[in-house]
Amino acid sequence: HYKAVAAPSSSTVFNGVLRVEQDAQETNAFQKSSNLMLDQPGSGIPSGKVHAKPELQILADNVRCSHGATMGRLQEDAVFYLRSRGVPQDEARRILTLAFALEIVDLVPDEVLRQQMQNTLEALPSF
C-alpha cells in the first residue's frame, strides 16, 4: 500500500509493478495507491499533481490479484467537525493530513524507525 500527500504546487509519482511469475500459482496479492491532494487554504482547488500507475504483470493462471488507485481531498465534513469542536482550520487540516499519513507509519514493525518517521511527519509545516 502506497500513500502520498501532494502539497500545493507539488507532485507525486507512483509507478508500481506487481509481477507474478508462472510458477507462483495460488498467489494472493493486492496493490493500492492512495493519494491526498491538498489545496491552498481558502482556494478549494488542489494545485498539486498526482500521477499513479499501478500495474499487474500476471504470468500464472491460478492467482488472485488486484490493484487500485485513489485520489482525493480532505473531507470538508471532517474539517467542519473539528472546527465545530474549537480546532482552528489550519490545525484541523494538519490533524487530518497526519492521520492519513500515519496509517502507513503505524504498520512499520520496528518501533524506533516508526517513531522517527512519526516525528519527521509531525515536524513538517502545515499546508
Role assignments for model-derived ranges:
Residues 1-127:
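Active-site gating/interface segments in enzymes
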